[in-house]
Amino acid sequence: MFKKILIANRGEIACRVIKTCKELGIATVSVYSDADSRSLHVTMADQAINIGPAPSSTSYLVIDKIIRACKKTGADAVHPGYGFLSENAAFVNKLEREGIKFIGPPSEPIRVMGDKIESKIFAEKSGVNIIPGHQAIIKDSKEAIEIAKKIGFPVMVKASAGGGGKGMRIAKAESEVEDAFNSSVNEAKSSFGDDRIFIEKFIEKPRHIEIQILADNYGNVIHLGERECSIQRRNQKIIEESPSSFIDSSLRNEMGEQAKRLASTINYTSAGTVEFIVDQNKNFYFLEMNTRLQVEHPVTELVTGVDLVEEMIKIAAGEELKLKQEDIKFNGWSIESRIYAEDPERNFMPSTGRLRRYIVPDNINSIRNDTGVYEGGEISIYYDPMISKLCSYGKDRNEALNTMEMALNNHYIDGIRNNIDFLTAIIRNKKFISGDINTGFIDEEYQDGFKANIIDKQFSLLFSIAATYFFTLDQFRSRNQNDRSLIFEKSLVAEVEKEIFKFKTYDKNDNLIIEFNGEVITIDSNYELGNPIASLMINGKDYSFKVERIISGYKLSGYGFSSNIKIYSSRAFELSKHMIEKNYALNDKIIRCPMPGLVISIDVVVGQEVSAGDKLCTIEAMKMENVIRSESSGTIKKIFCNDGDSLASDQTILEFS
């Protein structure tokens, strides 16, 4: 067994690997860039080595720096995590020449499966189902159009290298092919340094189902069931679960056998994942093989009880798999929500900054939170914006869903925008709950984008009740009155997104009573003002809200909703009807860069009239192209930058007349 393992990665996956190493009694080494000197993975490891400046191209992706760190610390093996060098065949070869063990597959399977064209050829030879398409490199957009027409629309334009949803675009008509091709080329070149593109048929309304495998050096290969990965934005997974509600045991076995057959054909060892797309008739087709540990591996661990990192380490150390296929049992259900620093209401624009508050729901049973951040830490512009992976477990899907909803409602982040409300909305979505999903779920269910302030009537009332309760407690505390009745006997008005609720509050037997439409609402809570999370029992039911005091009332979030609730006395409400509310959005004619990034294209000209939703420009940030659209109609007055310019956060892009 290895004595010391260097983790050639950062963030939550580095922390995850360190945990298993500690359990096995193996010493650990973290590497870090200048931007990560205070990161969690640095403090968790036994040793830590600086490997250079913040950009990954000068630190985490530099093979020689990783090898020097191994030699300096005496590490005899490297775990690559995922991303960075995890699927780099040259890295594996160089480690081998230096006598350092790579905890993963040999270089040749990595090379073959890393090329989406060559991998499909091997898959077909192995008897694995593949998608119809043009399995060759396409030289330009003109050729792409001709090939797409031959295949038949819709088509998927894809980068031959890489993964993670980068370098992929769907073209539903001939008019969309050129833009899809050019965007895929640019994103692939930026992300992988490889701009080779191919085209295949796009399967309508598919599910994204993947099979986890383990293979050792003695010819033993097993599968550990499937993961449902259909909930995606920008072709990148955000919610995964195991098992899938769509897959029966017969289909699971068939997909598992094809995955095992492919692994055997390419002499694969270690943990790996064979990804498939599955159509509505349960026909499945090979998508790609990820020759590394997947981001979403925890859901498999939770339903099988197998530590995949431990198995990877043991296989790399030359041990034979003790597990046989018949040993793998699937118990219960697990769901993973990826919590990202991004703004779902602005086309998932990445967010950066300091985590002023970071409260994890660690008091909830059957929850696992894999993270690489801490309160006070920063989300950098240089790396993936993932904050954590929140996983729930239950005896069945309903229990796992309920636990996940509870955990998301009790997970609080302040300082950066995040997708918790969006994830909660999906978990509560009726189609999602029923299992009626596909990879286009988000586009179908949120055609006009996600808006957390569009609240249904049930929660408008609940939010108004909660805000009224907080307001009354706050008033009592701030006035420091001994006679509670002087404070509580009031008529209050709550306004939730233009909807009005009128309440009467008073004290009865030293308890706060709230009446609505003549009915008494009972509230039981130990909430302390100032706490950002409030647990209230309203009419016998438990609810959790995230609470922030604002000038006019409270900002409340929970259950996929977020809103500023204004609280008035009856007189103040009547007076407010005569006040004109200033619309700041109408007065802001400047479009600014939301975060540091590179201008890929300016898509308007001075004097051009645009409408709400029109594309203004494309900014590359965190290796993803982000389209900035107009929020209102107007005329372009001035443009302050050009294609190829690097912009700072809040730097002016253009101005409206």
Label every model-predicted segment.
Residues 173, 215-220, 279-282, 362-363, ...:
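Short acidic-glycine loop/turn motifs at beta-strand connectors
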Residues 552-593:
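Catalytic P-loop NTP-binding/switch module of NTPases
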Residues 104, 159-161, 172, 213-215, ...:
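Flexible glycine-/small-residue-rich
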Residues 583-657:
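Structured functional modules or segments
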Residues 166, 243, 384-390, 587-589:
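Short amphipathic alpha-helical segments
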Residues 259, 298-300, 304-522, 527, ...:
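Catalytic cores of soluble metabolic enzymes centered on carboxylation/carboxyl-transfer
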